[in-house]
Amino acid sequence: KGALFSLGLLCAAWGRLQAQNQPLTAENLCDLAAQMTAGITRREMQATDTHGLAVHAAYGAKGVRGEAESGFASVRELAMPQLSRPNGRYLALLSLIAHVRDTNVLHRAGEEGLHWLQSRAKDLFSTFSISAMEQLDRECIDRNISPGGCADLLAIAFFMQSVIH
């Protein structure tokens, strides 16, 4: 649901930029998305009828709504700079996992699981190898941890990279 919300929002922002003859840049796209969602966290985070809302109530993580409100700061600051590097797609994902309070991880594994995964991602980021990435994947499967929010943010980074370039 988070990826659909985010990509729909970014497509709407893209359309508005085109309609207003504004340049399509990552900054313009994300700034407009932030304007379009200003206050969404405060307005919508009172309920607990989704995993994201329940995690917000329990841990304070803002999830996809917070990312949108921030103009997808995690995508711009953590993922996008990695994409041009060798193994950039892996490094972008690891950078996101290492720093984002992923609501899916919190839902499945709590703060302890999130801290474990973030620590592993930071270590792997600095000493990257495909085999170590595969090992982390197996460990996540064994622990029933899925950084789905970070995967959504990576998809957003790919989308932004493709429409900007």
Annotate each PLM feature.
Residues 1-11, 143-158:
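Conserved phosphate/anionic-ligand binding catalytic regions in large, soluble enzymes, centered on
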